[in-house]
Amino acid sequence: MNAEARTATDSGIPLVAVVSSYPLLAEAVEGALEGIAEVRAFPAGQGDTADFLRLLQPAAVVVDSPEEAEAAAEFAREARATLVHVSLREDRLRLLHAGRWQNLSDGSASPERIRSAVAAGIYLRGVRT
């Protein structure tokens, strides 16, 4: 099974997993990615994030805590998936790219910036809708 088949839903739309302690973050991401990806929300703090993501095989993951970012990074590196860490406290975005964290914004962790980071990662990876 190729990466595109594994990371897209049955409709061919890429799957994005949001692992968050805040349901409003998942709602904001879902609204921002409407028409681009299917978004599924999962509660943070379950302790098995990397294994869960391996089973789910999303094209991208959005998390909102350093602990979940670290756990999801293990999956993202293995699967070459896009990983965006949204720091709500610091109003900042980080993107895991080529195995390293890059700061995307300071002072603007808006849904639009999250959309841009996720969409760019998905399309650069070759998963198309």
Please name every model-derived segment:
Residues 2, 13-56, 60-128:
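Internal alpha/beta domain cores that form substrate/cofactor-binding pockets in large enzymes
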Residues 1-4, 8-9:
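Extreme N-terminal leader/targeting regions
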